[in-house]
Amino acid sequence: MKDQKRLKNILAESSRFAVIVELTGGPNYNFSPIEKFLKSYQENQGRDLPSDFILAGITLPQNPGGVANIDPSDVIAVIEKERLAGDLDIIPHITSKDANTDSLTSTLAGYRRRGIESILALTGDKPTTAQGVFEVESIGLLSLIKQHNQNTLLNAKPGGWNQVHQFYAGAAVSPFKYTEPSLMQQYYKMEKKIAAGAEFLITQVGWDWKKSLELMQYLKENRISIPVIGNVYWLSTLTPAPRLMHDIKLPGCFVSDALLAQLQSESVDQHIDRAAQQIAMYRAIGATGVDVGGVHDYPTFVKILQRAAEIGTNWQPYKDNLYWPAEKTFYLYEDNGRQASLSKPCKKCRDRFFDFMHLSILDPDYPGFHVFKKTLKLFGAQKESNFTYKAFNAIEKSFKYLMFECQECGDCYLPENFGYCTIGECEKGMDNAPCGDATVEGYCGNNLNRLCIGEYIYNSASAHKNGREKLRQMTNKPRIPSLEHTSSLVNYLFGKDHTMRSPLIQIAEAIHASIPKTGKIMKELHALGADAYTRPSGPLDYVRALIETQADEGADYIAVNLDAFGEDNPDMAVEMMKEYVKLVRQWGKGIPVCVDSSNDDVLIAGLKEWYNTDQPVRPPQLNSIKLFTADKMMPLKKQYDFCFIGLLVTEDKAKGPGGSHSVEELFDLAQQIYAKAMQYGFKASEIFFDSTVFPIAIDMPMEPGVPGYTYRAFETIKRIKSDPKLKHCHCSLGVSNCCRDLPGRKIGICRAYVAKAMECGLDAGIVNTSHQYGLKEVDEELLQLISAYAAMDGSPEKLNEAMTRMGQFCASTRKPT
């Protein structure tokens, strides 16, 4: 069956060595080379292939070499129409060179519709005649694919996991680099690609067995477990490929003078032998398979594999035939297996100048930043229509063009790139340089007159304290297109660029067992048995998607609430919380957990499990501690570092109007919780007060003169934030509760609710992170509605205004019957 032949299953389970073959159209967009190969394979279903090899599929490049060719989507359409694929997987290359993110998303949707699962995500070759796009590069593309997979999972119905389409995305890596910066940047970027969602690797073409072995050693040394497919290109003088690679006409590919001369002196059979020897080499050193390219003649392809099978794993006698390095070489590992020492360059004048300027006026930890920002604000430079803005922007553009070849992206990554611009100083204008096209000397393969920007960035990073590790860990997000041609300095200073964060401390709410769909999937997961939280499954993938998407959306804490399971079985909730805390620690990208429960035993279990690891973790949050549980929970601070949400509720009878707690009572509770927390060693910044959200749909006082719940919640926040002692504490609300039972526009209501609460001092919230509260514009009418409820102090006039606005809102959102 075809499902059993998918590349993912073969790489993971097959005892045979996987082979995929790269097929391209001929001159003048000719499909016949692809058709001829596939028909030859179909004639005997691969029975002429060696028994210990399995042909898993075909890969379809997208405009290789930057030259227009048949698009993979069109090739797939013909293959499907003529039923040429049989049991083979179809693995299209998808690149960002010719398409923006909208177009890439459409392509992914089309592949999903066709059932294409395996894809190879690449930056792509720079077009030779057309204008490249490169809105994202390989890391951004992999992130887009991962987001597509997550959305598909999150939209799936419980129990239907077998029908959920998931892309199996691969990425490229080139170990065939001979300068330290080029090589290390390839390995760093490889790690970033894996973090972004790459599930298998395909190497670049190259003929240096030491470099191939070096890649496998690097993966092992760094405990990276991922299938590796070696790229075996049939290099033969029957085609112009050797000459083009030698003459740097195919950037990223290297054929030395010696190799070219050797090829020209050899027969075709000797060319076949070299490809076979390389396959045997990859098989012996631990690769999971090979990608064979440059072969459109099926009998030749079979001959290569048969010869490789004869060699088996005894490839060492052919080392010299697979060793064609550059003249000047850098190898990460010495012959004895030890890692070579990396360079320790000194800062250049440019580095020192950039660091000085950045620290002086652009580092928020230094006074100059705040003085500079206030000065620009004083002159109105934050408004694009002002003359001051235009004058400043003109000066900035001129200066930055002279210094950094600035291209006015408006979303500047100079600090992240150690003072180098990856648009103006890179031929592809990439977010995460380099691309892999550099020559063996480190020059740009697309412009031999300039050194690859990756070389500059690496050398500058190496000159900074911990710079290499920072470079290794840092991934730049795609730039914000709408900021192009605006002032990047103004955008940075006023939080409009990629550094923009929500003004709220976001406590992500999605992992909550009381949410019907989520609770059902949690139950389904738990029913899978003792290894449910470690064995791959649809429900576990769903939970992982919840965790990762919330982390990507800027969560500061990832909340887990399992109280729905603890209603009948408290011990079950305790054990489940331990498992979910592990999952957040594993997949939360360093974001701490918020253990959310009304059961103190669950809180304690989650807190202890969070620290049950040898890895460093950030302090978690407990939600919640009440005044009457403080003496049980707060002593844990001595052993475990954590912050907490102090819920402003009490077991005492309310004394406020209408039998509810007044603002004074709620404020008094906050003061008492604060005093307790100080006794147990908490800082004010580790306390989050929750004055409780009441749905505005039912926020109607039952007696005259009684303030509304929204009024009390907001006024309590005001009191806390204006108190000399409590003002450094945080105020948090469960925002999504405010829109419950409303007929529509719930997200807009939540946005307006947050905006109004922030006016009162709200600085944290249990929220749906995808709504990006505090960053998107609020509807004025909805803000007026929330303002009316926030002002409902018990007077008839305020009550009447709130009810009138609610009536108008319901009338405008009611759906026709």
Residue ranges and their predicted role:
Residues 2-10, 147, 296, 314-396, ...:
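Extended, intrinsically disordered, low-complexity segments
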Residues 3-63:
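N-terminal beta1-alpha1-beta2 module of alpha/beta enzyme domains
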Residues 17-39, 90-102, 167-185, 259-274, ...:
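Active-site mouth loops of central-metabolism enzymes
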Residues 38-61, 193-197, 284, 541-563:
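Catalytic domains of carbohydrate-active enzymes, especially glycoside hydrolases
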Residues 65-304, 313-319, 367-398, 405-412, ...:
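Catalytic alpha/beta core domains of metabolic enzymes, predominantly
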Residues 70-82, 103, 564-614:
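N-terminal active-site wall of soluble small-molecule enzyme domains
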Residues 507, 511-517, 521-553, 558-570, ...:
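N-terminal loops that bind phosphate or other acidic moieties
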